[in-house]
């Protein structure tokens, strides 16, 4: 502030502080006002030192004067400088108002003096007014370099406006009178905008070449005293000196090289502006409710960016501004006439737009339209006589609009009779309810008819039927025997349904009109009295005579009712007669060939009980089903059908009507699988541009296609009665049901078959079909196109598929699949982002969905921070506070969505180009186009594949996403333009093995460029110090050490807390990078750390890795190498000892790597690894704990059931819709399992025989499933001599072992699922893993080892039993070591090689073989009296 205070000193400061800010005000000027003024001058590129002198103040005022019409701030600045000037000149002023007036007087006087002097001198020496070229005291032209303030102002403009249209006038103003050298200085200051500068350079080169073509250089030397003609490159300042530029600009006649170069730059800036704001002036149209002022703002903002001459821009303003206004404003503007100024236009159009204005205009027009002529202008002309009917609203009762356009709140109840509980279209008052009660529709099946059959008799067309006789409809039998249609005349609706009718003995031709309430005839004389009446006809009101109780005969059926006679254009038989004769309008089911459908093998239909429903739901469902039955969509069934699916009803959105829903989940599980006909939805960017387009919708799509007859029984459902008063009413579907899994696929394939003839017949028509949406495009003239569309609709109708007029779109924009299609462009349907105070999880999910949908055409949409709000397990209704970043992101997205953005259509003759830009950390955006600035499609990518990543890796992921998208939409891969230099890509691609293929691409200089921030050397750096690094941590205490040892004997160790081995390894590398010189070799034994750093990440989710990245960027060269741990390698062993002391318990575990490898493949449990690789349990458990697939549950401890070796439990389990049969050996837990095609007795028996052929099976234990109790299984068990036992019904514990094994097996299948393509492979892999790679339970064996051990032990035991029986026939005589007398005989229990085991008097002894005699016991008779053996009997 001190520097600026020096502007005034001493007495001047006193007089400054006496001047009032306002006339008569109390506040006076202070020093702070001078400080403020000096700051403001920086914005206008003016030197602040000018304030110190009166001349300086004059110069400032000259600069500011042209801009005084601008803001208030500018006016304040001018006034302050004027006051300061008065203080410098010692002109006495009391307040701010007086100062500018004084200045004005002085300026006028000096101007007159200058003019006078000019007259006197006769303008002999005109001084160039061109600044920065000025004349010095000697009269020479010299150059004043462009000031830093001007450059500063220019840089600010570019940074703030980012090449928006405002940049061009700003540039033009700042470069007033500049030389080419000055202009190049200005361009160099904004050289960071590389893409823009490149475009500018191209434009300048083109213009310079054009200049050289028009102004060829003269050949030979230049005559003395003359200056050379400038070339294109001279004008651009590249081959000319500053002196030459000044001479050209000040010569007589001058060559304004500065102005020419400036014009070229402005041309280039125009192109840049077009790229940065790619909206054409032709696209600026006023919205229906947009204020005229906003439209004008948008129009002129875009006009400034247009590349056109001033004349063309003038023409655009005169014509396009009016032409593209909305109809309301256009009417007013045209009335103003062609010469109207913009001010007049804006005044006239103030407040125009919106419904209130429309109502005002309409009211005025109606009040003026008194005569018939005015009425003719307002109303449509008609061919019918009589007065025009005035429309009146049912809802509010006012005239002039219909109820559907009414803005008043909706009146409750019916608009016709006023009663609540139904709407007008369901009202029975004054309306023959001919589509509801007593309808005669065949109850049988929809008959298959060939399209060639005569349509007059075909029930597949829309038709009217008239019932003969008064008998009500006979019930159709279960087999659809009621071929009722034979009794009825059938009138098809291919032509108008005209019939001959007998009235009062006269025959006349009349139209059967199901839409007319009354019967109206013309030119017929009827007997009896009549009364006059007015009725509303097609062309207005007509006067008729009303005759009551008239007999009428149609098709042999009589009816008595009211007939009206009057001037009707055609005789009409209305509903008052049609209902009496039982005439029905029938919606037949399509004659499309049915697609055969089956249940999955071995499965039966659903048998799910109907749950109770409320009375109102039962009533609603009864009504709906009656209607569906009349239309042939469902049929009643008897008790013979055992299947059932539950149904329920829900209220339709914003309506009192109910909607029937069927819970087909169980049937869907049991129905065969279908191939999804269409894998995704079509995208408009893949459409080709067509001259004529129509969008159609197939009405009641699924209900138009018949269901396979043999499958219908499985769709049975029941409408229950209240309090089980009567049995429920049972129905089954005849058509594709909503919610059944086969409906979409069958409908799509049927639709394709139906459309095939149309596609073949009209190859010039493009038909896109997605479910019931049809897009038809052609290059035909609109009349021919519409004729073809009618042909197509007719063709669809022959097959029973209607295309309602309500959803038939003839004019653009077409709404299709959530997109809005225009003739030459497309966009997504308008997206409204909700404004909310509190956002729930569900709200944010919907918001992200909307933004993702919009991102396919709106470039720059981001959702990263909004998605972050959804992290963690939250309930849908939880309220989530928005973070500042998410608020910012949402605000940016709202801004982007404000301006509508359009994509164009695909031109197969041009190549596709995809351009990618980096938007921010982990956020990318791309555009796919064929011509610049005309995007087919845009998109974003914001995934982060791994914790440590870099831009190159992400760029490859983006490219692969776009390539896939290209193949799906256009069938080809676009050519890529990527913001990465070829050298950078090559370096990374050759070094980093995980890089995937990327297609053909070229470099585009769009900042920010993707680069590798550092590079690791491939060979050790000679002369650089080598750091051996290591880290260790204790799992229990979380304490650790990290450190390094160098080849020069230096060492450093730090202690860490709350760490892990992996973190400690990274700490050691960070320490080495921190302590080392710019070039360093680092040796680690951690594969983990090596893997992270070799991928060259430039950012990471880990703070520690980010620190390492920072250190790596600072280094000149880094070589990182790995050595195996604990292998006695010099420096590695030294550092290992240092960091291990007091930390590591086990220093050397060689088997870890192999164990980890085995675990990745087989997911063995810790016991198996501990025993196979000699690992301590804690290490083996750690391997299991670090595996994400084995984290599902804790380690299972398999206890043993004490069972005999021949018992197996069998069961069937289901996975992925397939059946797996599982057999478990109860004693060992060993499994045999395989996928079987069906859960039948045959398959089960075959499996049991296979099992018996491999293992000794004595007993099988199964549940009571139909396959296990089948005859085939009994026969197999009888043949293989296996006893079959059954579990207790409904008690899963009786099958406990196999049930728990099913779970175990499914768990293992889940762990190895991604290694196998088919389930049967995964099952066998899981069996192998369970049997041989999991240890535990008795003996710590695996199940495979245990079963072999159990069977072997069993055989040995049996053998032993036999031996024991034999051995018991021997007697042993023995003697002790001290006693020479033989003792015995004792029982022989065991005879070994060196000793025998004997039992003597219940005492078991081991006797050496040499001291025992074994004799066979031949019985008593063999022994003599004095035989030693005789003692036995005495004993």
UniProtKB/Swiss-Prot annotation:
Catalytic activity field: Specific for a P1 residue that is hydrophobic, and P1' variable, but often Pro; Endohydrolysis of RNA in RNA/DNA hybrids. Three different cleavage modes: 1. sequence-specific internal cleavage of RNA. Human immunodeficiency virus type 1 and Moloney murine leukemia virus enzymes prefer to cleave the RNA strand one nucleotide away from the RNA-DNA junction. 2. RNA 5'-end directed cleavage 13-19 nucleotides from the RNA end. 3. DNA 3'-end directed cleavage 15-20 nucleotides away from the primer terminus; 3'-end directed exonucleolytic cleavage of viral RNA-DNA hybrid; DNA(n) + a 2'-deoxyribonucleoside 5'-triphosphate = DNA(n+1) + diphosphate
Q: Residues annotated as region Interaction with human PPIA/CYPA and NUP153?
A: 188-226
Annotated site location: Cis/trans isomerization of proline peptide bond: 220-221
What keywords is this UniProt entry annotated with?
Answer: Activation of host caspases by virus, AIDS, Aspartyl protease, Capsid protein, DNA integration, DNA recombination, DNA-binding, DNA-directed DNA polymerase, Endonuclease, Eukaryotic host gene expression shutoff by virus, Eukaryotic host translation shutoff by virus, Host cell membrane, Host cytoplasm, Host endosome, Host gene expression shutoff by virus, Host membrane, Host nucleus, Host-virus interaction, Hydrolase, Lipid-binding, Lipoprotein, Magnesium, Membrane, Metal-binding, Modulation of host cell apoptosis by virus, Multifunctional enzyme, Myristate, Nuclease, Nucleotidyltransferase, Phosphoprotein, Protease, Repeat, RNA-binding, RNA-directed DNA polymerase, Transferase, Viral genome integration, Viral nucleoprotein, Viral penetration into host nucleus, Viral release from host cell, Virion, Virion maturation, Virus entry into host cell, Zinc, Zinc-finger
What processes does the entry annotate via GO biological process terms? DNA integration; DNA recombination; establishment of integrated proviral latency; proteolysis; symbiont entry into host cell; symbiont-mediated activation of host apoptosis; symbiont-mediated suppression of host gene expression; viral genome integration into host DNA
Residues annotated for Mg(2+) 3 binding in this entry: 1211, 1263, 1299
Q: Where is the composition biased (Basic and acidic residues)?
A: 445-455
Q: Look up keyword Plastid and say if it applies.
A: no
Record entry for activity regulation:
Protease: The viral protease is inhibited by many synthetic protease inhibitors (PIs), such as amprenavir, atazanavir, indinavir, loprinavir, nelfinavir, ritonavir and saquinavir. Use of protease inhibitors in tritherapy regimens permit more ambitious therapeutic strategies. Reverse transcriptase/ribonuclease H: RT can be inhibited either by nucleoside RT inhibitors (NRTIs) or by non nucleoside RT inhibitors (NNRTIs).
Tell me which GO cellular component terms the UniProt record holds: host cell; host cell nucleus; host cell plasma membrane; host multivesicular body; membrane; viral nucleocapsid; virion membrane
From which residue to which do the Integrase-type zinc fingers run?
1150-1191
Per the record, residues carrying Phosphotyrosine are: 131
MF terms in GO: aspartic-type endopeptidase activity; DNA binding; DNA-directed DNA polymerase activity; exoribonuclease H activity; lipid binding; RNA stem-loop binding; RNA-directed DNA polymerase activity; RNA-DNA hybrid ribonuclease activity
* Identification of the protein by name: Gag-Pol polyprotein
What is the originating organism of this protein? Human immunodeficiency virus type 1 group M subtype G (isolate 92NG083) (HIV-1)
